[in-house]
Amino acid sequence: MTKFALVGDVGGTNARLALCDLASGEISRAKTYSGLDYPSLEAVVRVYLEEHQVTVNEGCIAIACPITGDWVAMTNHTWAFSIAEMKRNLGFAHLEIINDFTAVSMAIPMLKAEHLIQFGGSAPVAGKPIAVYGAGTGLGVAHLVHVDKRWVSLPGEGGHVDFAPNSEEEGIILEELRAELGHVSAERVLSGPGLVNLYRAIVKSDGRLPENLQPREVTERALADSCTDCRRALSLFCVIMGRFGGNLALTLGTFGGVYIAGGIVPRFLEFFKASGFRGGFEDKGRFKAYVQDIPVYLIVHDNPGLLGSGAHLRQTLGQVL
């Protein structure tokens, strides 16, 4: 008889829940709930289990915030809870709450060829470290290493490292944003809001007033070629994505590959393919040759967070992935 566990992927707006076959890792019966409609994550879980008339004893839920102990307070939502209390209230034997990019990193060993698009480099080297990053509401970062037949995710807050410009244009962007924000992290330019920051800085550096645009509007105008400033912003976004990915590759020697997740890049895939992304990735001066063969992949799986939550739980329960 198939045994299922609950898996989840929770962001600032939505909570996506599903069932994971503990034997195969297959994800099924995924459903998305608006976080605004429920007082707590526990309430959403109860509704999901009731709707699907299923009883589970284990669960793993990925959340877009740092997980440092039993108390979880979401940074972009009002939900806050004790993991131990939620586990007890739901009657679970095992409940894991993990960082969203821990889940995305754990999905990587589960992905098939059709879930990936490669951008340069050669084949990944088995057993070598892996990096994953992705722009969305923020900039998530994690690494993945294989140790003693187990995958170990190394999450952190890498999106908040300093933005490091490497061209005259990028230097001007930094000056504009520093005057407005003080500290300028990579997330300030590599995210949905970051794309708007790039657009605004480009316009302001030319002594003009920027329009009050949303990220989607910047992208749409860039792709329609109806706004030169938006197109410059999107082009710069792609190059800086490359630089940042190259930095991750250098930091941990990620010859196992660098993976891009998140919802932004797939919206302008053809533009991204023709952009300066790979050039930015390899623009490492004396260490260009070091990163040239490292492959970069865009993850195009629909639910890597759910897939990775299931993989994390299965490994925690003793399976070899």
Swiss-Prot record:
UniProt-listed Enzyme Commission number(s): 2.7.1.2
Catalysed reactions listed for this entry: D-glucose + ATP = D-glucose 6-phosphate + ADP + H(+)
Cell compartments where the protein resides: Cytoplasm
Cellular component terms (Gene Ontology): cytosol
Residues reported in the UniProt entry to bind ATP: 8-13
Pfam families referenced in this protein's UniProt entry, alphabetically: Glucokinase (PF02685)
GO molecular function: ATP binding; D-glucose binding; glucokinase activity
Gene Ontology biological process terms, A to Z: glycolytic process
Keyword Kinase listed: yes
UniProt entry tagged with the keyword S-adenosyl-L-methionine: no
Keyword list, A-Z: ATP-binding, Cytoplasm, Glycolysis, Kinase, Nucleotide-binding, Transferase
Similarity comment: family membership: Belongs to the bacterial glucokinase family.
Name of this protein: Glucokinase
Gene: glk
